[in-house]
């Protein structure tokens, strides 16, 4: 016998179409009914578009998030003796920060249950990067996750199928219905998974600039405020940093390339911007869980963070000493003129890395572990005509032409302004606590 439904999809769609607030029972029902396929994709598509056009008030967003959490399981870390804290980034080009950050924060005394994702389009995915390490496993059971956390203090793995299943369905639908940009839907998608993950504290790294999902700083700040509010209402200590993604982070964009750079950072070296953001986020995470007597910068220098990295990779089946994959072919792109690099477009660099095979255009597509871009000079650097700007790496040489096309006009080279300043976003645009 079929279930008697509390509402009809049409009345919920009409309410939002006509700019009314959805009631808590309407929200609970529509998320549950969609998860069990009692609401069709066509109907949910119409509701998502109405939300995009007419928005949601904070109570609606909070209830929508709760309903998505309640569609699946909640993880429980009460068996751990350490406080739990996580970081979520909205993604960008060269954003490998999770790789050095999780072991660094664990080395300082917190537990970091980092449920990560795969890349899509020009933004890289943490799991794709780590899967370039021979033997490393992204899929762990809840019991395996707990064991790695107990033994190492940090785990980076894929979210299980039981975590916010409503979000998985909604995410796929938003992707094909031009409703990805709706801030209430972005915020609830991210926060439903993070709250269900069971962490007691969360630092959000909301990227802005050309290479970010939220390129407009005002929109990025709005998203950050909404997500911080959702976290706090759910009892999770939450803050957000809006950070720059106008130029790539570090000197690599790719999978194995970014793992190598992350290991350099854990060894006490690496690019200054990656070190700065990693340490900054580590301090924020530690402060949220009351660990203030350790300086994460010291843990990078003394090798403790590297020790945790090696343990964590080994615990997930990887070999921390294995040679990382390299691409079969490479091509150097040179500077067309002499001068100071005044700007670099992160989006163009990210698209080029994607075209070389470092990313995917559809969920489930394979990526090339060795593909990507090395960046030899960044804004503020002086270059001579003919000097190397980028080295492109791929297993498919036919991809070079399209990648080069993406990189056309990706840098501006000229004379430094009289005041000596380059017009770009500060690394941290804003810190948001409410």
Go through each PLM region and give its residues.
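Well-ordered secondary-structure scaffolds
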Residues: 7, 11, 16, 21-23, ...
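Active-site-proximal beta-alpha loop/turn segments in soluble metabolic enzymes
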Residues: 48-52, 129, 167-176, 205-214, ...
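Alpha-helix C-terminal capping segments
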Residues: 53, 100-113, 193-198, 233-234, ...
């Amino acid at each position: 016998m079929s279930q008697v439904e509390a509402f009809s999809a049409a009345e919920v769609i009409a309410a939002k179409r006509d700019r009314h607030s959805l009631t808590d029972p309407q929200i609970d029902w529509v998320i549950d009914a969609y998860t069990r396929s009692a609401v069709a994709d066509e109907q949910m598509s119409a509701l998502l578009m109405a939300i995009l056009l007419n928005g949601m008030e904070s109570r609606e967003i909070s209830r929508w998030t709760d309903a998505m959490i309640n569609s699946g399981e909640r993880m429980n870390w009460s068996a751990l003796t350490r406080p739990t804290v996580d970081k979520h980034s909205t993604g960008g080009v060269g954003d490998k920060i999770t790789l050095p950050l999780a072991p660094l924060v664990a080395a300082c005394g917190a537990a970091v249950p980092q449920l990560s994702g795969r890349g899509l389009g020009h933004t890289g995915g943490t799991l794709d990067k780590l899967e370039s390490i021979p033997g490393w496993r992204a899929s762990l059971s809840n019991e395996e996750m707990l064991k790695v956390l107990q033994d190492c203090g940090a785990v980076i793995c894929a979210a299980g199928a039981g975590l916010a299943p409503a979000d998985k369905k909604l995410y796929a639908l938003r992707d094909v219905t031009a409703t990805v940009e709706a801030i209430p839907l972005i915020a609830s998608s991210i926060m439903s998974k993070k709250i269900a993950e069971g962490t007691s504290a969360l630092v959000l790294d909301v990227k802005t600039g050309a290479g970010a999902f939220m390129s407009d700083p005002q929109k990025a700040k709005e998203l950050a405020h909404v997500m911080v509010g959702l976290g706090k209402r759910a009892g999770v200590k939450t803050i957000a940093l809006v950070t720059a993604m106008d130029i790539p982070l570090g000197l690599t964009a790719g999978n194995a390339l970014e793992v190598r750079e992350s290991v350099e950072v854990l060894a006490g070296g690496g690019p200054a911007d990656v070190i700065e953001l990693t340490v900054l986020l580590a301090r924020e995470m530690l402060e949220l869980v009351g660990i203030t007597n350790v300086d994460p910068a010291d843990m990078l220098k003394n090798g403790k963070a590297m020790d945790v990295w090696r343990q964590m990779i080994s615990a997930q089946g990887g070999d921390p000493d294995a040679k990382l994959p390299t691409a079969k072919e490479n091509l150097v792109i040179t500077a067309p003129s002499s001068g100071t690099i005044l700007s670099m477009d992160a989006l163009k660099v990210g698209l080029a890395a994607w075209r070389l095979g470092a990313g995917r255009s559809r969920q489930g597509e394979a990526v090339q572990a060795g593909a990507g871009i090395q960046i030899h000079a960044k804004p503020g650097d002086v270059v001579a005509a003919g000097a190397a700007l980028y080295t492109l790496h791929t297993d498919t040489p036919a991809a070079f032409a399209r990648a080069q096309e993406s990189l056309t006009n990706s840098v501006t080279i000229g004379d430094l302004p009289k005041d000596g300043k380059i017009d770009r976003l500060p690394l941290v645009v804003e810190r948001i606590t409410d």
